[in-house]
Amino acid sequence: MARQTDVRPIVRLRSTAGTGYTYVTRKNRRNDPDRLVLRKYDPIVRQHVEFREAR
């Protein structure tokens, strides 16, 4: 089993456009201790929007 304080946990990125679309990725806690924000494509609104880490 994985440790609770895994260095690279799996995080869910949720669209800020309000569509409910999500990406699943991993992040390195040592390099990115804050919540992750990436600009990615949301196919529901057909444009690039910010995706924020949802906990």
From Swiss-Prot:
Protein name, entry field: Large ribosomal subunit protein bL33A
Family of this protein: Belongs to the bacterial ribosomal protein bL33 family.
Gene Ontology MF annotations: structural constituent of ribosome
Keyword ATP-binding: no
Entry GO CC: cytosolic large ribosomal subunit
Classification via PANTHER family: 54S RIBOSOMAL PROTEIN L39, MITOCHONDRIAL (PTHR15238), LARGE RIBOSOMAL SUBUNIT PROTEIN BL33M (PTHR15238:SF1)
GO biological process, one term: translation
Record keywords: Ribonucleoprotein, Ribosomal protein
SUPFAM superfamilies for this protein: Zn-binding ribosomal proteins
Domain of life: Bacteria
